[in-house]
């Protein structure tokens, strides 16, 4: 499943490969025209694009249901190539180490990474890199109007939205209201207790919220270096204009979300 960006990357990587068929689920009418053209113009026999009536979360729920059916998955040799696959997260850890080496002169320096986030995959890789010992002072999580993750890091309440409550924005790859990989971070936050995570996600699977603000776990949050913020359409426009005027760099809307929140949290 894709919200717009990784779908074409996966399809182009797999096109023409023998013994592999790709079924790519995407939210109908919710991606940019360029993203749709990248994916839907492929005519390879082993690439099948499926437009789902709903948001990205609906497409991702289908993929998760297939992945959770072990017998069906094994029988048809099905694998997932988006961010619910641990291999995807593991590969992204490398970005943070490389970024750190490019930005610093010595191992004594600390850095902050700002990550525009819908799903929690990319910044989860940053969290793991930090846990591995990479000197990351802050992980700056930026959302668009679909601010379920920002709400959690500000309040302790994780409240996934349904399709009707999910906004269609000008940074469409972040139009996600039920973040994958977030349970991987919560696992660390609650002391790596699988029973606690299981209980919390039983609520999520029923469409309910959970609140950690009054628990002992919430006191641990500062130890993980996360801060968060939200960006709106007008913020994106202003940030794109700022970057063009100051640096002569044209940003895409998702990067603009990340830069806007980063600028608010400069240290």
Model regions: which residues?
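PLP-dependent amino-acid enzyme catalytic core
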Residues: 1-267
């Amino acid at each position: 499943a894709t919200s717009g960006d990784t779908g074409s990357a996966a399809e182009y990587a797999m096109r023409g490969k023998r013994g592999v068929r790709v079924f790519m689920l995407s939210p109908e009418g919710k991606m940019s025209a360029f993203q749709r053209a990248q994916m839907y113009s492929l005519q390879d026999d082993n690439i099948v694009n499926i437009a789902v009536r709903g948001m990205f979360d609906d497409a991702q729920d289908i993929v998760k249901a297939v992945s959770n059916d072990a017998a069906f998955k094994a029988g048809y040799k099905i694998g997932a190539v988006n961010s619910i696959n641990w291999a995807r997260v593991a590969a992204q850890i490398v970005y943070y180490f490389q970024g750190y080496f490019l930005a610093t002169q010595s191992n004594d320096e600390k850095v902050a990474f700002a990550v525009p986030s819908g799903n929690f995959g990319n910044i989860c890789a940053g969290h793991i890199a930090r846990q591995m010992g990479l000197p990351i002072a802050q992980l700056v999580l930026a959302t668009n109007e679909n601010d379920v993750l920002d709400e959690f890091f500000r309040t302790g309440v994780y409240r996934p939205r349904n399709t009707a409550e999910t906004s269609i924005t000008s940074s469409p790859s972040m139009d996600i209201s039920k973040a994958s990989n977030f349970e991987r971070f919560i696992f660390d936050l609650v002391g790596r207790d699988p029973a606690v995570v299981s209980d919390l996600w039983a609520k999520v699977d029923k469409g309910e919220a959970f609140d950690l603000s009054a628990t002992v776990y919430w006191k641990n949050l500062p130890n993980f270096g996360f801060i968060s913020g939200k960006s709106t359409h007008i913020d994106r426009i202003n940030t794109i204009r700022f970057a063009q005027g100051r640096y002569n760099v044209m940003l895409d809307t998702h990067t603009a979300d990340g830069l806007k929140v980063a600028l608010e949290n400069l240290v």
